[in-house]
Curated annotation (Swiss-Prot):
Gene Ontology MF: a single term: manganese ion binding
Catalytic reaction list: oxaloacetate + GTP = phosphoenolpyruvate + GDP + CO2
InterPro entries hit by this protein: PEP_carboxykin_GTP_CS, PEP_carboxykinase_C, PEP_carboxykinase_GTP, PEP_carboxykinase_GTP_C, PEP_carboxykinase_GTP_N, PEP_carboxykinase_N
Originating organism: Ascaris suum
Function: In parasitic nematodes PEPCK carboxylates phosphoenolpyruvate to oxaloacetate thus introducing the products of glycolysis to mitochondrial metabolism. Catalyzes the conversion of oxaloacetate (OAA) to phosphoenolpyruvate (PEP), the rate-limiting step in the metabolic pathway that produces glucose from lactate and other precursors derived from the citric acid cycle.
SUPFAM superfamilies: PEP carboxykinase N-terminal domain (SSF68923), PEP carboxykinase-like (SSF53795)
Keyword Nucleotide-binding carried by entry: yes
Listed EC numbers: 4.1.1.32
Family of this protein: Belongs to the phosphoenolpyruvate carboxykinase [GTP] family.
Gene Ontology biological process terms in this record: cellular response to glucose stimulus; gluconeogenesis; glycerol biosynthetic process from pyruvate; oxaloacetate metabolic process; propionate catabolic process; response to lipid; response to starvation
Gene3D superfamilies referenced in this protein's UniProt entry, alphabetically: 3.90.228.20, Phosphoenolpyruvate Carboxykinase, domain 1, Phosphoenolpyruvate Carboxykinase, domain 2
Stated name of the protein: Phosphoenolpyruvate carboxykinase [GTP]
Annotated cofactor note: Binds 1 Mn(2+) ion per subunit.
Length: 643
């Protein structure tokens, strides 16, 4: 079946005057930028998609400040952005309340073979690590959406680099979008503009093709809420990994529209990494310097709401320690010529969850967004300041009038929320006071430790070290976290989130684990793998560990293990835990070490049974035998544990 949306132009199917004229005699003016200077294959991509989506004009972005000022002025005039007058160049955006988050149920991988994308799950079991759609079905979905979808709107051409422009680990993308909000956010989140096009001409021309539309051609058929066009009923976010292509329709929200982020930097990048021998992971990267002046680099993978950004920007409570951030969300990692694992942060900004962020929980994040930042779905005070849950004690006037994220009057103490729980700040990473001087080093920084973790209210000790690289992969595959459950459930439940990658898997998870195992073979010098749990609770539901800046005490122990100190750990069935007295607890009141580090036999036996069921249901026959052996061996070790 021929799919109109996926058909390609030949070089003579279009011509350029001061406009793009396609072979079907559609004339589309280029209102900014020099179309002729684009590489020919980029011209072809832009022309064929312009023919498909029928924009009224083409705008080639250069990433300059003048361009940003022009777009911001337009957005303010239309009411899309509201200036937060208490700051320099900070703006607030309120979205349609139906378009506020990533939409996992509408996110797809498109491959000819289903099990390239998802695992062989038993009949009747829905895979939770990715969704597959056939190319034929996808073609129909595209043709039901994209033809003519940009009518009456400008199509922006965004050339961008994930990673420093021209770097050995960096990759280029070009996003076509009809949203100027997306342009402004991509300018913060990626390296964007003319330098990318110059690099593209040098690097044999490879780029990831990204197509995004809000899905509301003009004249719009439905009412636009908050000046935010979207089409939630027809939203789709789809990836064609073999073709290095992303299609997104109907949503303007960051994770669905800033296609360099999760779509490219994780789902597509992990496919490129599989082909080229590297890894794309949902991990922070931080540099930690000891009082002796020794610096090591750590990568850490936590599910959402487990403190990744807080750890990346940690303010140590122990004198002499220093933490500097490379990245807070995504790591691209490749083994270097010396055998060590090197990581870059492919992003250029922070796209952080606002609620809960405060000077108490993360002062460095707060310092990062005092200017040049776009806030989405937070509240605004009458004084022109941002506000969200967690800032109640930082407001100068607690009785100040506010407008909440829905555009309604609001005051502290009201039952409704001031900010949406998934409200965001989009801020330049370079504004963070503790950004590492090497954060843009093209070859990356050497990783000594990989840390997994999640919210585990019971049973799981504060920290343990895996027994080996393969056991560490097993530990990562077992990551679970307490999450506020979906609407059809009540209360909270602990949910699986393997490697903190469950929502972002770009191919079969069994193959993903085998990729990790393959990369761990000699001559590669693999980092040590650890698991942390800041969130263990006592019987009366109080946290056993203070967390935040005191987490440096655990990082200290981890780094001493990386230095080869064998005297500070003791072996347990699940890995190596700190010997009593080897974590610095000075100044901490009433830490119940025994409860914090205990490994309850009954809990862990039950956990292994549940994990086995999870692997059987969600990984099935794709589970590597080595991981099955780790599960079996750990179960036997736990059985031998004395009560």
């Amino acid at each position: 079946m021929r799919c109109r949306s996926l058909s390609h132009f030949k070089d003579d199917d279009f011509a350029v005057v001061s406009e793009v004229v396609t072979h079907k005699q559609n004339h589309i003016p280029v209102i900014k930028g020099d179309f002729v200077s684009l590489p020919k294959h980029v011209q072809r991509f832009v022309a064929e998609k312009a023919e498909l989506m029928k924009p009224s004009a083409i705008f080639i972005c250069d990433g300059s400040q003048n361009e940003a000022d022009e777009l911001i002025a337009r957005c303010v005039e239309r009411g899309v952005l509201v200036p937060l007058k208490a700051y320099k160049n900070n703006y607030l955006c309120r979205t349609d309340p139906r378009d506020v988050a990533r939409v996992e149920s509408k996110t797809w991988m498109i491959t000819p073979e289903k099990y390239d994308s998802v695992c062989h799950t038993p009949e009747g079991v829905k895979p939770m690590m990715g969704q597959w759609m056939s190319p034929d079905e996808f073609g129909k979905e595209l043709d039901d959406r994209f033809p003519g979808c940009m009518a009456g709107r400008t199509m922006y051409v965004i050339p961008y680099s994930m990673g420093p422009v021209g770097g050995p680990l960096s990759k280029i993308g070009i996003e076509l979008t009809d949203s100027d909000y997306v342009v402004l956010c991509m300018r913060i989140m990626t390296r964007m503009g003319e330098p990318v096009l110059k690099a593209l001409a040098k690097n044999n021309g490879e780029f990831v093709r990204c197509v995004h539309s809000v899905g509301q051609p003009k004249p719009v058929a439905t009412k636009v809420i908050n000046h935010w066009p979207c089409n939630p009923e027809k939203t789709i976010i789809a990836h064609r990994p073999a073709e290095r292509e992303i299609w997104s329709f109907g949503s303007g929200y960051g994770g669905n529209s800033l296609l360099g982020k999760k779509c490219f930097a994780l789902r597509i990048a992990m496919n490129i990494g599989y082909d080229e021998g590297w890894m794309a992971e949902h991990m922070l990267i931080m540099g930690v310097t000891s009082p002796k002046g020794e610096e090591r680099f750590v990568a850490a993978a936590f599910p959402s709401a487990c403190g990744k950004t807080n750890l990346a920007m940690l303010e140590p409570t122990i004198p002499g320690w220093k933490v500097r951030v490379i990245g807070d969300d995504i790591a691209w990692m490749k083994f270097g010529a010396d055998g060590r694992l090197y990581a870059i942060n492919p992003e250029y900004g922070f796209f952080g969850v606002a609620p809960g962020t405060s000077h108490k929980t993360n002062p460095m994040a707060m310092a990062s967004f005092q200017e040049n930042t776009i806030f989405t779905n937070v509240a605004e005070t009458a004084d022109g300041e941002y506000f969200w849950e967690g800032l109640e004690h930082e407001v100068k006037n607690p009785k100040v009038d506010m407008i909440n994220w829905l555009g309604e009057p609001w005051h502290i103490g009201d039952e409704s929320k001031a900010a949406h729980p998934n409200s965001r700040f989009t801020a330049p990473a370079g504004q963070c006071p503790i950004i590492h001087p090497d954060w843009e080093k093209p070859e990356g920084v050497p990783i000594d430790a990989i840390i997994f973790g999640g919210r585990r209210p019971e049973g799981v000790p504060l920290v343990f070290e895996s027994r080996s690289w393969v056991h560490g992969i097993f530990v990562g595959a077992c990551v679970k976290s307490e999450a506020t459950a979906a609407a059809e459930h009540t209360g909270k439940q602990v949910m699986h989130d393997p490697m903190a990658m469950r929502p972002f898997m770009g191919y079969n998870f069994g193959r993903y684990m085998r990729h990790w195992m393959k990369l761990g073979q000699p001559p590669h010098k693999v980092p040590k793998i650890f698991h942390v749990n800041w969130f263990r609770q006592s019987a009366d539901h109080k946290f056993l560990w203070p967390g935040y800046g005191d987490n440096i005490r655990v990082i200290d122990w981890i780094l001493r293990r990386c230095s080869g100190d064998a005297t500070i750990a003791e072996e347990t069935p699940i890995g190596f835990i700190p010997k009593k007295g080897t974590i610095n607890l000075e100044g901490l009141p009433n830490v119940n070490w025994d409860e914090l580090m205990s490994i309850p036999k009954s809990y862990w036996l039950e956990d292994m049974v549940e994990t086995k069921t999870f692997f059987e249901n969600q990984v099935g026959s794709d589970l590597p035998p080595e991981i099955a052996k780790e599960l079996e061996a750990q179960t036997e070790r736990i059985k031998a544990l004395k009560e």
